[in-house]
């Protein structure tokens, strides 16, 4: 008991997370470890086709990587796999962010002595944590944050950007609705800039009030005007003092 470990490959879309997971699967298989790959039921992007990596294919019947047929289990909740993991040494889970019970069963299985290797996103296209990731991350022994390539300028990319206007947190898609971007590209959209700065200033105002025992209440319209007039480069204290009701 309590001898397992949790390893997590993360980063933006198109950052090679699943490739790292699959390579580990093959290495562990060669070492005669009993391996199980768990995939998310509703992620059917790659059914009967080749993924980002031409070595990797998924059909409704099997998962193949570098000509190795993998032991796979497809489910919507990790609880569905709880009865079968005892037959395996190492559990691999792809797209971990989609499993609502991820933090519960990753911890449970690691406590049972299983090594757990994960691949997936930490944050949404709005750079907010996926539901449950705040509970999972503190349980992990090792995290690798991989980068992708910004499609706009070739720089290292650490953020995922959605290219349509849908605001739902979970929309499963590929390069038809997502792209990997660097910080500069992420902030090229004025709506994104204003939204993020408003959130930062609001949080800063709460901290400032707590620190100074004050009760400043921000006028959002004034804050927007202040942000734009100062071209996003300003002293936050000046902003909250000039833009309170």
Q: What residue ranges belong to the model's regions?
A:
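Structural motif
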Residues: 8, 90-92, 117
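Charged, low-complexity interaction regions
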Residues: 210-218
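Charge-rich, solvent-exposed alpha-helical interaction surfaces
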Residues: 200-207, 222, 226-227, 236-239
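Short amphipathic alpha-helix with an adjacent loop that forms part of the alpha/beta core around
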Residues: 78-85
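Conserved P-loop
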Residues: 2-78, 125-132, 180, 187, ...
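Conserved P-loop NTPase "ATPase switch" module shared by AAA+ and STAND
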Residues: 87-99
């Amino acid at each position: 008991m309590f001898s397992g470990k949790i390893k997590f490959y993360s980063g933006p879309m198109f950052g090679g997370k699943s490739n790292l997971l699959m390579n580990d699967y093959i290495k562990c298989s060669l070492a005669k470890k009993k391996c199980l790959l768990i995939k998310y039921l509703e992620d059917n992007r790659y059914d009967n086709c080749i993924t980002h990596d031409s070595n990797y294919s998924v059909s409704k019947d099997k998962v193949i990587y570098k000509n190795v047929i993998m032991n796979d289990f497809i489910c919507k909740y990790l609880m569905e796999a709880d009865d079968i993991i005892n037959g395996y040494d190492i559990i691999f889970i792809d797209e971990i962010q989609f499993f609502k019970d991820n933090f519960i069963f990753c911890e449970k299985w690691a406590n049972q002595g299983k090594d757990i290797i994960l691949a997936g996103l930490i944050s949404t296209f709005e750079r907010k944590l996926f539901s449950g990731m705040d509970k999972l991350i503190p349980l992990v022994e090792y995290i690798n944050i991989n980068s992708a390539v910004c499609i706009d300028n070739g720089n290292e990319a650490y953020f995922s950007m959605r290219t349509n206007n849908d605001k739902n947190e979970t929309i499963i898609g590929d390069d038809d609705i997502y792209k990997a971007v660097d910080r500069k590209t992420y902030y090229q959209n004025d709506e994104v800039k204003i939204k993020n700065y408003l959130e930062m200033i609001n949080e800063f105002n709460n901290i400032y009030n707590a620190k100074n025992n004050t009760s400043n209440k921000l006028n959002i319209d004034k804050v927007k005007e202040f942000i734009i007039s100062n071209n996003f480069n300003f002293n936050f204290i000046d902003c909250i003092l000039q833009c309170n009701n």
